[in-house]
Amino acid sequence: MVTGADGFIGSHLTEALVRAGYDVRAFVLYNSFGSWGWLDRCEADVRNKFEVFAGDIRDPNGVRAAVKGCDAVLHLAALIAIPYSYHSPDTYVDTNIKGTLNIVQAARELGVQRVIHTSTSEVYGTARYVPITEDHPLQGQSPYSASKIGADQIAMSFYTSFATPVVILRPFNTYGPRQSARAVIPTIITQIAHGLRRIKLGALHPTRDFNYVSDTVAGFICALRSQTGIGEVVNLGSNFEISIGDAARAIAEVMGVEIELLSDKQRLRPDKSEVERLWADNSKARKLLDWQPQYGGLDGFRRGLSATVEWFKEPANLRSYRSDIYNL
C-alpha cells in the first residue's frame, strides 16, 4: 500500500510499482468530489490497475482497514508545506505524527513485512557539516520539520520496541512533474511560463540538494526489495549542491529567457527558521540499497529540469497552477 498516493511523489511511485508488477493499494485522502488527486491523470497503461482506498491517515480505524491484507506499506502521506506549518502547527502534529503512529501500529498488529516511512532532509536543519550523513543532529527549525522528527522517532521506536520492520527514507528536495506550486522549482517555472520575467522568490542564497522524482521513486523501490535496510535511516540525495538563485537561473536558461530575481518578503522564512544549507551524503543508500541517482550533478540537474519544464509547459498541466498568488 502507498499512502499519499494522490500526491506528487506518491502518484509517481504508484505508477512505477504497478509497472513493476506489484499489486498496489493506493491510499488517497477522502473528499466529497471523488478525486484521486494526481492519480486522476495517471498514464493509460496504469489506470484501473490499482485499488483505491479513500480515507484519512489521522483515523486509526480507517488506516487499519486499509493496511489489512498488505505485505508492505510505503508511507508518504503527510502535510509538507513549511509556511502553512507556521500558522497551523496542530494539523502537522495530527497528520504527520499521529498519522505515522496509526501506520506503524496497524503494521505491527497485522504482521506487515515492511514499512517504509518517509522522512525529509528538513529534519537536519541548517547543515553543521557537509555532505550530511544520517547521523547528523536533528534540528526542528519549523513546525513542519519538528513534526517529521517526531514521526521518524515514532516509526523507529516501533522497530526498536516491537521489531516492526521499519525503514526510514530521508529524501532531499524532490522535484519533477506534478509537484505543488508551493515548492521552489514549480514556482519559478510557472511564473516564467505565464510570461513573468521578474520572478518572486524567498531567500536566494540557501543551498539545496535536488532529486529528480524518478530517482526518489527508485529509492523507494530499492528499499522495498532490499533485505539490508530494516532498522536503518537512509538519505536519498543527488550529492549535488546548488543555491536557490543559481537553480532559478538554470531554469531560465533551460526555458530560454532572461529573468530578474526578487526576494519577496512574504516568501521569506523567519530568520532562525531558514535552513541555510542541505547537501546529502548518499553513500549509505548506494551501499545498503544498491541505489544511485540517475540525475546527479549539474548535468543531471539540467536534464531533470528540462523534463520538468516540458511537463509544466503543456497547457493542460499549466492550467492547474496559478502564478499570480503565493502558494503556501
Language-model segments: residues:
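N-terminal Rossmann-like NAD(P)+-binding domain of SDR-like oxidoreductases, especially those catalyzing
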Residues: 1-174, 303, 307-317, 321-322, ...
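A short C-terminal helix-loop "cap" of Rossmann-like NAD(P)-dependent dehydrogenase/epimerase domains
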Residues: 44-50, 135, 162-165, 189-200, ...
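Residue-level signal for the nucleotide or nucleotide-sugar donor/cofactor binding architecture
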Residues: 58, 87, 95-98, 135, ...
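Non-catalytic, hydrophobic alpha-helical segments
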Residues: 73, 216, 220, 236, ...
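Glycine/proline-rich active-site loop of Rossmann-fold NAD(P)-dependent oxidoreductases
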Residues: 149, 174-187, 194-199, 213-214, ...
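Hydrophobic alpha-helix immediately C-terminal to the catalytic Tyr-X-X-X-Lys motif of short-chain
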Residues: 150, 154, 158, 187-188, ...
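C-terminal "lid/loop" region of Rossmann-like NAD(P)-dependent oxidoreductases
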Residues: 203, 231-234, 243-248, 256-277, ...
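Conserved C-terminal active-site "lid" loop/helix of NAD(P)H-dependent oxidoreductases
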Residues: 213, 233, 268-296, 303, ...
